[in-house]
Amino acid sequence: MHPARPALWAAALTALTLLRGPPVARAGAGAVGAGPVVRCEPCDARALAQCAPPPTAPACTELVREPGCGCCLTCALREGDACGVYTERCGTGLRCQPRPAEQYPLKALLNGRGFCANASAASNLSAYLPSQPSPGNTTESEEDHNAGSVESQVVPSTHRVTDSKFHPLHSKMEVIIKGQARDSQRYKVDYESQSTDTQNFSSESKRETEYGPCRREMEDTLNHLKFLNVLSPRGVHIPNCDKKGFYKKKQCRPSKGRKRGFCWCVDKYGQPLPGYDTKGKDDVHCLSVQSQ
């Protein structure tokens, strides 16, 4: 595997794509949907000149761009292949997603326990969406849709006849009242969640000591990403952690446009091990290194 491919940017990209949905935008491209936007450096001729020749058929049936902000081409994974943060991308029409039985989807992707599956909305979201409400219940989404429908009736239109049963002023008041009720409910939920967080602070602090240093760094980084509208590939590094929360032997930085990625070896506390070039162009093998 090329040192640029285990790009840790794939953690943020895959997680955001799976759980939040926004696409990744290159520099100059417009953001679609909500969520952070990753602005990558352009893949110009200088960056492409540093790429190795792409694999050829029959070993490779489809070429895709390497994960993160890399510019080189690599083989795409096929449907059913194992995937995750440190793997190549899935092929066209596929998406790397955790298995339905996974209790911690993001952690599964970080540990490479995902699989390439059809990217249709039904297959991706069925395991994460709540069960459909009974006919007598109305969800907030339905209320928003109904409110929007009522509000659209208020707007004059030459192509629509206003129903005499719905007076424009009365309909507009219903929209306002529903909006105020939703805001009040949201405030109540937020207040109750804050109270619960305060009560559980001591227990969370106690559990935090059980996590390894890599796990704590990774969670701090991901929590920080939630509040960013624009992500800079230069300033974010998501560590490679083992199941116990300690650092894996091999850590990598992703490619950044014309700048190639690199890897280095560390002990389980994240300290670089001597004798390994941290910015070498060749792949770094840490399998024989004992992380003590």
Swiss-Prot record:
Residues 129-139, 192-203 have a biased composition (Polar residues). InterPro entries: Growth_fac_rcpt_cys_sf (IPR009030), IGFBP-3 (IPR012211), IGFBP-like (IPR000867), IGFBP_1-6_chordata (IPR022321), Insulin_GF-bd_Cys-rich_CS (IPR017891), Thyroglobulin_1 (IPR000716), Thyroglobulin_1_sf (IPR036857). Glycans are attached at residues 118, 124, 137, 200. GO terms for molecular function: fibronectin binding; insulin-like growth factor binding; insulin-like growth factor I binding; insulin-like growth factor II binding; protein tyrosine phosphatase activator activity. Disulfide bonds join 40-69, 43-71, 51-72, 60-75, 83-96, 90-116, 214-241, 252-263, 265-286. One of its GO terms (cellular component) is nucleus. Residues 127-161, 191-211 are annotated as: Disordered. Residues 36-119 form the IGFBP N-terminal domain. Phosphorylated by FAM20C in the extracellular medium. Phosphorylated by CK2; resulting in decreased nuclear localization. Multifunctional protein that plays a critical role in regulating the availability of IGFs such as IGF1 and IGF2 to their receptors and thereby regulates IGF-mediated cellular processes including proliferation, differentiation, and apoptosis in a cell-type specific manner. Also exhibits IGF-independent antiproliferative and apoptotic effects mediated by its receptor TMEM219/IGFBP-3R. Inhibits the positive effect of humanin on insulin sensitivity. Promotes testicular germ cell apoptosis. This is Insulin-like growth factor-binding protein 3.
